[in-house]
Structures are given as structure tokens and as C-alpha cells.
A protein has these predicted regions:
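PIN-domain endoribonuclease scaffold, especially VapC-family toxins
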Residues: 4-6, 28-42, 46-110, 115, ...
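Hydrophobic alpha-helical membrane context
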Residues: 21-23, 62, 145
């Protein structure tokens, strides 16, 4: 049986890192299911960066129970990095204009990082993507897991 790699989208990563996120339970359930299926969860560098940006924004804007940035970075992101679990993908998407064209063709439904995921998947660099983003998952021929 071939092991399947599944890229975790930023919304799934945020759900895993922020216990107050509306997708926290769903993200944990999805991760448990992927583990049960023996799928390998893939953390792409630009998606971890996007997730951290969301967590940083919440740390300054959320008045009740803001995320603990030190814990998120110290117990999760730094550990993932030290263990080699964060995959560098920025260099794989050298087609900046191609990524922009995908974003434009979506009429703005996809942000730059979502368009980059579509490009990486179309080129065979990545496989399925675990995401709760309906616009991303609706892209024609895009393989997603939710």
C-alpha cells in the first residue's frame, strides 16, 4: 500500500494551533483521520507562515483568550522546523506570474497562497491538500481532503 501525502492548508494549521479557532475540533478530527489512514501530513513553509500571520493578528486583536504566541512558536512551529517537518516549497513555485494568473482567473476567490497550491498541484509537486476553504476545494481538478 502506497503512503499518501496530504498538504495541510493554512486554515487547518490555524485550527490545530489555536484552541479557540472555530475549526479547532474539525482540524483535530481531520488530522486523526489522516493518521488512521496512514497518510503523511505535509507542512509547506509558506502555509505555516500564513498560519502564524493569522495567529499573530489574533494575538493583538482578540480581547478574550488571545492565542499564546510563545507556545505556538515554541511548542509547535519551532519543533516542526527542528524536526525537519516543514517542507520548503517557495523555491518550487518559481512561476510568480503563473500563480498570479491563477488568482486572477479565480476572480479573486483564491489568494496568492491558494493559487500557489493550485500551481504546485498541477505541476505534480504536491498531492492532495487538506483544506476547509470551499473556494480552493472547488477549483476544477484540484484534489482536496476535508
Amino acid at each position: 500500500m502506497m503512503t499518501r501525502e496530504v498538504v495541510l492548508d493554512a486554515n487547518v494549521i490555524v485550527g490545530l494551533l489555536d484552541s479557540r479557532d472555530v475549526l479547532h475540533d474539525r482540524a483535530n478530527t481531520l488530522l486523526l483521520r489522516l493518521k488512521a489512514e496512514r497518510a503523511i501530513s505535509v507542512l509547506l513553509d509558506f502555509l505555516v507562515a500564513e498560519a502564524l500571520s493569522v495567529i499573530c493578528r489574533r494575538a493583538t486583536q482578540r480581547r478574550t483568550s488571545p492565542p499564546d504566541l510563545a507556545r505556538v512558536v515554541g511548542q509547535h512551529i519551532s519543533l516542526w522546523f527542528e524536526q525537519g517537518e516543514i517542507t520548503p516549497a517557495l523555491s518550487e513555485a518559481t512561476d510568480f506570474i503563473g500563480t498570479c494568473e491563477i488568482a486572477v482567473s479565480s476572480d479573486g476567490l483564491l489568494n496568492f497562497n491558494d493559487a500557489r497550491l493550485v500551481l504546485l498541484q498541477r505541476r505534480g509537486v504536491i498531492g492532495p491538500v487538506a483544506s476547509f476553504d470551499e473556494s480552493l476545494c472547488a477549483v476544477e481538478n484540484f484534489v482536496s481532503v476535508s
